[in-house]
């Protein structure tokens, strides 16, 4: 893979410079636990002819968007027999307008209904033109968690919910949920049960301390 950029690189609005102490490499970002796909997405958010500003806000936005896209594609494989999204192709043909291509992918994802595996496979094929969504949703969640199994904490939270419904005291549920959110874990509680997933700012050490 080759990444090119023809304009100034910034970090949180300031020029990237060793003298300012804000210089880092892609390897540094990976060592911080930021997935490579998130780094790629942040880069693609800015056209290569424009100044690129690396910010924590963009990292969070990229992570959240990838979470959504992976939730849509689930465990499907790319269907290369389908023609890719013409809006994505047109954006890339327009002087590699990667930002417009990303927005086209997001719009495409928004039209896909749950269970429509054919459409999901088409989205995955289109995303592949940008080097995105190379894995399954489960693989993505596992990567973000650093291999940490969240199922035990999910089961504990569900047990607390059941007990709280009987006692009408939800303080233990709220406490564990708050701790999980503070550790960067997304908590989804439905009638079917509890689903935990790594979110933006996932802190593996904090999660381990909750076990």
What are these regions (language model features)?
Residues 1-5, 13:
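Second-shell residues forming the walls of enzyme active-site clefts
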């Amino acid at each position: 893979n080759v990444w090119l950029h023809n304009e100034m690189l910034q970090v949180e609005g300031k020029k990237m410079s060793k003298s300012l102490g804000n210089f880092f490499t892609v390897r540094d970002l990976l060592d911080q636990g930021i997935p490579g796909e998130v780094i790629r997405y942040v880069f693609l958010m800015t056209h290569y002819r424009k100044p690129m500003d690396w910010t924590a806000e963009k990292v969070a936005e990229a992570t959240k968007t990838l979470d959504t896209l992976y939730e849509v594609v689930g465990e499907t494989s790319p269907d290369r027999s389908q023609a890719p999204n013409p809006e994505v192709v047109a954006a890339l043909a327009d002087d590699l307008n990667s930002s417009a291509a990303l927005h086209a992918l997001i719009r495409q994802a928004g039209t896909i209904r749950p269970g429509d595996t054919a459409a999901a496979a088409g989205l995955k094929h289109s995303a592949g033109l940008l080097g995105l969504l190379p894995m399954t949703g489960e693989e993505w969640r596992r990567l973000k968690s650093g291999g940490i199994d969240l199922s035990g904490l999910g089961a504990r939270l569900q047990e607390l919910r059941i007990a709280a419904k009987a006692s009408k005291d939800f303080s233990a549920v709220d406490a564990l949920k708050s701790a999980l959110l503070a550790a960067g874990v997304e908590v989804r509680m439905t009638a079917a049960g509890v689903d935990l997933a790594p979110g933006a700012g996932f802190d593996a050490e904090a999660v381990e301390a909750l076990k």
